[in-house]
Amino acid sequence: MQSIFGTDGIRGRFNEELTYSLAYKVGYALGSTLKKKSPILIGRDTRISGDILLQAITQGINESGKKFINLGICPTPAIPFLIKKENLSSGIMISASHNPPEYNGIKIFDHNGQKITRYFENKIQKLIEETNQNISVPTKVIPLNTNKNLMDIYIKSLVQAMDGENLSGLKIILDTCYGSATTCAKEIFQSLGADVRVINNSKNGSKINMNCGSTNLAPLKKALKESPADMGFSFDEDADRVIGIDSKGNVLDGDHILFLWGRELMEQKILTNNLLISTQMANLGFEKAWKKIGGVLYRTDVGDKYVHEAIKEKRAVLGGEQSGHILSKINNFSGDGILTALQISKYCKKKNINLNDWLKSSFEPFPQKLTNIKLNFNINKLSLKAKILIDKTIENFQALYSHNCRVYIRPSGTEPLIRVLVEAKSHKKVNSLSSEITNKLSLEINKIIN
């Protein structure tokens, strides 16, 4: 059986790669594998398939003899935070993050609130393979009670992380992407005194990630133009990422957030070895500017779990991805978009500086272009020989073009895509090289497959 786990848990189109039967087996296998007797915490995003997958997983957990707590619709970071806070055995988040509405996923966290290891994934996979029965989908979804008290504990922790600072006097616009941030983002910012306007704020699972959120900033930019504010924040669907926009429409991505937040920690002398952890996607302009002020940037493979591993290994206190996935010591290194947005707002208020001026003090990014090569096949389902040939081809392309620019090529871990990042000193060079590389690489990959 092909591994059901990708780079970030289990992910796929509902009723195709991710079925009711598979979700049931995941719940059963997880419950059967855990030694700790305390309940398993479960949350989900607003996707339409979330309810039926929740029922499947909880049915499997019940069959294993374990108990569960249903948190309902919630931000992904609430799950790892509450696992550790409440001493729970494990946790599951039903979400496909930035993927389209027809996708869903299952992220599993251990008793420490960390994503499970490859070893643990293999144990679950083995048990699933041994569970041969095909589970039929029930005709009716049974509503499950949700635990609102735990959600209140998570919300309180975000407010406490403000260290007594309020946001009075700040006008802020939030794009909650029809997703998990709709549950609490507006209320948290308002409770701290901010004047808040929210867009895309209904729990509409059919609209998530569709022309909104952290991967499409046009609605937030439009809202800031129509109704001027000090800043805006756009969350991804499960609220573990965030991208900011200043009053002039300039983008504050994960690289800028790391630089500005990191510089604050450096000045407070609490940034271990002046070290930040990021990935191969981090902008070269960010790296050069960070080194110029005495900082060290350590790059990992793409994915928050690789950032987390490096943070642990290097004993860093801050890391993240350009996509807005920021991991800090504040909340046990779980990416939390709402927490990140609050911290940026806090520093602006505390320093009495508008985000536009603060952003100007960071760095000028190098022109960068990310292009997706769409595939009509799943790389993970190819033969080992074909996968090796594709990996070698990617390696050769990166080496061939490295003298002209910075090139980073990787297959997506969640979609049938190959992502090509090209970075150079001019937009013209980036565009021409990006076009050349993607066209030639597409031809080479088609030769391998055909």
From Swiss-Prot:
Domain of life per record: Bacteria
UniProt PTM comment: Activated by phosphorylation.
Residue positions binding Mg(2+): 97, 236, 238, 240
Enzyme Commission number(s) of this protein: 5.4.2.10
Keywords: Isomerase, Magnesium, Metal-binding, Phosphoprotein
Catalytic activity field: alpha-D-glucosamine 1-phosphate = D-glucosamine 6-phosphate
Active site, UniProt feature: 97
Pfam family, one: PGM_PMM_II
Cofactor mode of binding and number, as noted: Binds 1 Mg(2+) ion per subunit.
Annotated SUPFAM superfamilies: Phosphoglucomutase, C-terminal domain (SSF55957), Phosphoglucomutase, first 3 domains (SSF53738)
Annotated GO CC locations: cytosol
Annotated GO MF terms: magnesium ion binding; phosphoglucosamine mutase activity; phosphomannomutase activity
InterPro entries hit by this protein: A-D-PHexomutase_a/b/a-I, A-D-PHexomutase_a/b/a-I/II/III, A-D-PHexomutase_a/b/a-II, A-D-PHexomutase_a/b/a-III, A-D-PHexomutase_C, A-D-PHexomutase_C_sf, A-D-PHexomutase_CS, Alpha-D-phosphohexomutase_SF
GO biological process: carbohydrate metabolic process; peptidoglycan biosynthetic process; UDP-N-acetylglucosamine biosynthetic process
Residue positions where Phosphoserine is found in the record: 97
Cofactor(s) annotated in UniProt: Mg(2+)
Family: Belongs to the phosphohexose mutase family.
Function noted in UniProt: Catalyzes the conversion of glucosamine-6-phosphate to glucosamine-1-phosphate.
Name of the featured protein: Phosphoglucosamine mutase
Gene this chain is encoded by: glmM
